[in-house]
Amino acid sequence: MSPTALTIDRSSSPARLAYGEAFNAASWYVDRHVAEGRGGKVAIEQAGEQASKTVTYAELAEGVGQAGHALLGLGLAPGDRLLMVVKDCPEFFFFFWGAIKAGIVPVPVSYLMRARDLGFIIADSGCRAVVYSPEFAGEVVPALAGARTGARGLVLEAEGGVLDDVAAARPALDAAPARPDDIAFWLYSSGTTGRPKGVPHRHRDMPATCEHYAVGVLGLGEDDRCYSAAKLFFAYGLGNAMTFPLWVGGTAILDERRPTPATTFETIETLRPTAYFGVPTLYAAQLQTLDQVRDQAPAAGGRVGAGGGERVAGSSGERAPDLGSLRLCVSAGEALPPDLFRRWKAATGLQILDGIGSTEALHIFISNAPGDVKPGSTGRVVPGYEARIVGEDGVEAGPGEAGQLEIRGDSTTPGYRNRPELEGRTIVDGWLRTGDQYVRDAEGWFHYQGRADDMIKVGGIWCSPFDIEARLMEHPAVLEAAVVGRENDHGLVKPEAHVVLTEPLRETVGAEPAADALTAELVAHCQEGLPRYMYPRWIRFVAELPKTATGKIQRFRLRA
């Protein structure tokens, strides 16, 4: 085995990855493809207004080398951190892999953050520079000024921006020496309960997620075209839209626009991905669009936008999107309600493969699989990972017993940035405490109960907010729901539901206010389908739910 080699043995499950003494991930994910004859193949396609823009593997390798040289020429050195506030575009690939190849540590963060939070991350990360898309200057520039760390701003523009330095740089760049266990990049957690946390990852972490999940579970290969509505700046999107397609020599489809039913359906129709990665909120909104088209064309009946590419014209000229290129639909970020699974399959003929991952684990470690799906379940353990459920007494729970999910695998972070007290509570003896409550059934399927701090004790019995939310979402009037505990006049905790409707409420239904009528209907709906103690005592109709940039509901804000 050469010092830079990586060998993969797929004769067993999970596949075995064996590294040489040195391994710089950029060489494997970028340079390897040119060496293996894929230089002329399209690595990246851009959707939306940039739909004609493509980048081949040879052009990717050149762009990565130029970006790495430009960063070194601007004074960054191996080990320095480079914060990235960059939209989903080829430059994200160039600077992420260019930094890694040069020995610099890229740190992608959400471009939806405000200056205050960006300033915190600039200071917390100790980054030497921030590379950013020009449309985010309104937050990045004041964040840099407020942080007062001396970090340099590098705007992705020509004529005075960092793209001038890239254009002038040499494309050939030798990979900086690195070992498999060296830190390659950082991410920041989405912060469901407070300030984001810096999460370092090693060179070996990305191959583990790609081989165990992308190949081992999804079966991705060189012919696949991966499109992720979830963006590159967090772990789920980083895998879906970058490391997965580059691992197998496939094609990444990028869309810098905010994902909506209109933009995602347009991208699927025009660029024909084979694998689509979304989140439950977006699947719900897409279904709402499909339902509207179906209602406008009642004579057509059956599925709309099905895997076979059927087209249905509505009375207003609208038609169902052609989803015929898709063979895989994946969901993560929040648990997928079983009714969403059933409705999506009925409407499109496609199953949604629900799974759970985390920033700390880099991607999905429990998942449903093609042809092996249990609606309402998160799935079974991805080969290459271990999972256990631990009760409040610290003892591993048996089948049917609830507790906190802990996982272990080759992609989990070695620790946190500047958070030793959190690290000691979260990573114990190699086990990562996820903070999620789960039940595992006798067949090994894992069933989500909610975040540990979101569980509600009603009448002395723990109940899962997810079960109540899933029941509410079975009602045709409900688009989204979030349930928290609230004290009543007697100081007893009962469920409170915050509900986003599919259509605005009318003022009245007969002589009764519409809100009161629908509240009574939803309460009765829950009482019919849940144990009686679990029904929501209050229902609040809201325009939207508070969420992180990754789509996770921030229930702590609803409890405030």
Question: What is each stretch, according to the model?
Answer:
Residues 250, 273-277, 289-374, 386:
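Gly/Ser/Thr-rich phosphate-binding loop
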